[in-house]
């Protein structure tokens, strides 16, 4: 369960949507991602997430909704099979686990500076924090692989599959060799109200500052 929560925290970043400025057939995966980062400042959508161990064992699938607003604001709400909420207000990242009655608080730079969140929610150049390479097309998507330059990032690589200038699937291999796949759907670009990224810990919960 602890490892599942860590994966969910790492992937709270994967709320995405994009509007194409050029046809997808003319753009590489890198160009499509660059277009997404440059043109989509906010979006909402849904996700489904599954995790497989190096031995092939599967963890319970997760599903929920997300929202983001650049730079660095996002909301990742797991609804099934248990509730979990991860919210960044651009300065701090709050992870709330209702069943544990606990809120974990991290500074946003600490939480997403060199994580996959920086790819989709940040505003910097991808090549500054990641070594990026192209992958063969697969499952109707164009793919790229990003490997963190920081050895302490907590994951070894993240593959991003794109279609029509929209990230559609993310596959992350973490430090334990687990592969977490996130499927994105119902992507709706547009400004998201600031209230979506405000979080106040409920009374009675433990608040742990990292």
Swiss-Prot record:
Keywords of the record: Chaperone, Periplasm, Protein transport, Signal, Transport
Function: Participates in the translocation of lipoproteins from the inner membrane to the outer membrane. Only forms a complex with a lipoprotein if the residue after the N-terminal Cys is not an aspartate (The Asp acts as a targeting signal to indicate that the lipoprotein should stay in the inner membrane).
Protein name stated in the entry: Outer-membrane lipoprotein carrier protein
Gene3D superfamilies documented for this protein: Lipoprotein localisation LolA/LolB/LppX (2.50.20.10)
Claim: Isomerase is one of the keywords in the record: no
Subunit structure as annotated in this protein's UniProt entry: Monomer.
Statement: the UniProt record of this protein carries the keyword Transport: yes
InterPro entries: LolA/LolB/LppX (IPR029046), OM_lipoprot_carrier_LolA-like (IPR004564), OM_lipoprot_carrier_LolA_Pbac (IPR018323)
A single cellular component GO annotation: outer membrane-bounded periplasmic space
Organism of derivation: Bordetella bronchiseptica (strain ATCC BAA-588 / NCTC 13252 / RB50)
Similarity comment: Belongs to the LolA family.
Cellular localization per UniProt: Periplasm
Disulfide bond residue pairs: none
Superkingdom as given in the UniProt entry: Bacteria
GO BP annotations listed: lipoprotein localization to outer membrane; lipoprotein transport
Record HAMAP family: LolA
Signal peptide start and end residues: 1-26
